[in-house]
Amino acid sequence: MTAQTWRAHYAQKYQYSLRLFLLLNFISSSLSLVTPLFTVVRFTLPCALIVACSGLLLLWHWKWPQSKINIPTISLLFGMLWAWHVVTKAMLLTPPHFNYLVIALLSILFIGTIAFSNNITAFTLHSLPTFLACLIMAEGEQWLRMTYCFMLPIAGITLQNIIQKRSDAFTQGLMDKLMHERNTLNDLSML
């Protein structure tokens, strides 16, 4: 494995993560519009914006795969749209609306965990707005359970990132050592 293939691997990982994130948001928001969990309101503007933005970004990224889309910015934007959707819908439900809030929070956490299993920043930016919206809308009820649901994936992704960084450092060190030994052997064969 060369340094060039190493960089290509990370670029491909970035593209797949972005595409998966956009696809999961598109599917989840489409399902929220077509078959809503609680039928108090079927259509919300933020949910329609998520469908439109994720669909357009998916098409754009498919057409021009070399152009970079800033994942933290997109994840924060989608996180804020999801939080807006949750608040809009929760305000129309009759209290207690804890069941809806927990299901909405878990849905957003699943999207973030699946798409950003190697990017804690993007996961946090995507999930934090909805988490805060759910805490506020729950009015202090079940805050410990919601905090646990939010912190568990953060801990898992952080541990996975630590393990992955150690593995990457070991692999990179091994590759550098092999390249150095190859250069040494080439120098010796020249003599």
Model features per residue range: what roles?
Residues I108-I120, I154-K165:
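Short helix-perturbing small/polar motifs within transmembrane alpha-helices
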Residues Y16-L23, S117-T124:
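Select subsegments of transmembrane alpha-helices in polytopic membrane proteins
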Residues M1-Y10:
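Short, Lys/Arg-rich, polar N-terminal cytosolic tail immediately upstream
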Residues C149-R182:
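Juxtamembrane or sensor-core-proximal signal-transducing alpha helices
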Residues L77-F78, I120-L135, F150:
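Central hydrophobic cores of alpha-helical transmembrane segments
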Residues L37-R42, P95, A115-A122, M137-R145:
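Transmembrane helix interruption/hinge and helix-loop junction motifs
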Residues N183-L191:
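PAS/LOV and related PAS-like sensory modules
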Residues L20-F110, P129-F131:
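Hydrophobic transmembrane alpha-helices and their membrane-interface boundaries in multi-pass
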